[in-house]
Amino acid sequence: MADLKPYIAKAASGEPLSLGDAKAAFDIMMSGQATPSQIGGFLMALRVRGETVPEIAGAVASMRSRMIPVIAPDDAMDIVGTGGDQSGSYNVSSCTAFVVAGAGVPVAKHGNRALSSRSGAADALAALGINIEADADTIGRSISEAGLGFMFAPMHHSAMRHVSPSRVELGTRTIFNLLGPLSNPASVKRQLVGVFAPQWLEPLAHVLKELGSETAWVVYGDGLDEMTTAGTTQVAALENGQIRTFEITPEEVGLRRCSPAELKGGEAAENAKALLGVLEGKDSAYRDIVLLNSGAALVVAGKAENLKDGIAQAVQSIDSGAALAVLQKVIAVSNDKPA
């Protein structure tokens, strides 16, 4: 039986693990060969020392080797946050996914239930009537017929069951918050990824490059794992094999600046109702932040030339009813009914 203890000792001593060592350590954990105490100790040793790019890449390689895949078009993208930002905000990336799909870009959305917030992507989408436990074939059909499919992380990463108890007991963010957005079962090459802290912007952009992404924006919105309309968003963009960093304010793209309080969400049912309101065309601070993130996603997808163009397309997606139609189709297909 493989032993995690040498890797715990290495991490605890402050020594970085190579990509190969990191993959080996995660293989041990994901195959059920480590105790909950060992897993907790290893995760906290990495957290305290600070996870490195090779460690994250090795961990993702381990997760990807075990996942149940979903077939999606080559131009599909993911819009996802790491979670762990402790903000309790609305489900921005979930709402954004419908708007982007309504604008004509296939979305393979990867997400989970809340671990550190009151409502994760899966919680809100389930409250809307989407069957979050649909199988891989149904999700593939949802992407091709509705323009969007939701992949519930535990259904595709069943090996996570070995580490979930330790994560819940720790009650704090770990390397796994970073891994979810990097382990999309549809193996998308275009991503808009939100991170919970600015120090992860460039490292995650480098990991995505290492793992074969073509275009990606890694974003941090002044306390949110999304682009924000309540402050300044920092971006690390992977484009044409290069990584560049820049900042965006809502005013420079024609959006109203709001207060952080206006973006506060609630329980899943409340967030689902608010999400539906945005798709139905209601004006709000939630709509504005969704427009900003949708505009960025459309730039990443190659559908928009710039952020203002992307936002204009996002407005059209909502106001034409296209985004709402995507939601209705996804509900139907995920429950195995005709779209």
From Swiss-Prot:
GO molecular function: anthranilate phosphoribosyltransferase activity; magnesium ion binding
Pathway info: Amino-acid biosynthesis; L-tryptophan biosynthesis; L-tryptophan from chorismate: step 2/5
Enzyme class at the top of the EC tree: transferase
Magnesium among keywords: yes
Enzyme Commission no: 2.4.2.18
Ligand binding (anthranilate 1): G81, N112
Co-factor binding comment: Binds 2 magnesium ions per monomer.
Residue positions binding 5-phospho-alpha-D-ribose 1-diphosphate: 81, 84-85, 89, 91-94, 109-117, 121
Residues binding Mg(2+) 2, per UniProt: D225, E226
One Pfam entry name: Glycos_transf_3
Protein residues bound to Mg(2+) 1: S93, E226
GO BP, one annotated term: L-tryptophan biosynthetic process
Positions annotated to bind anthranilate 2: R167
Coiled-coil regions listed: none
Metal-binding in keyword set: yes
Disulfide-bonded cysteines: none
Alphabetically ordered keywords of this record: Amino-acid biosynthesis, Aromatic amino acid biosynthesis, Glycosyltransferase, Magnesium, Metal-binding, Transferase, Tryptophan biosynthesis
Cofactor(s) listed in the protein's UniProt record: Mg(2+)
Catalyzed chemical reaction(s): N-(5-phospho-beta-D-ribosyl)anthranilate + diphosphate = 5-phospho-alpha-D-ribose 1-diphosphate + anthranilate
Its biological purpose: Catalyzes the transfer of the phosphoribosyl group of 5-phosphorylribose-1-pyrophosphate (PRPP) to anthranilate to yield N-(5'-phosphoribosyl)-anthranilate (PRA).
Self-association and partners: Homodimer.
Record family assignment: Belongs to the anthranilate phosphoribosyltransferase family.
Protein's name in the database: Anthranilate phosphoribosyltransferase
Organism from which the protein derives: Brucella suis biovar 1 (strain 1330)
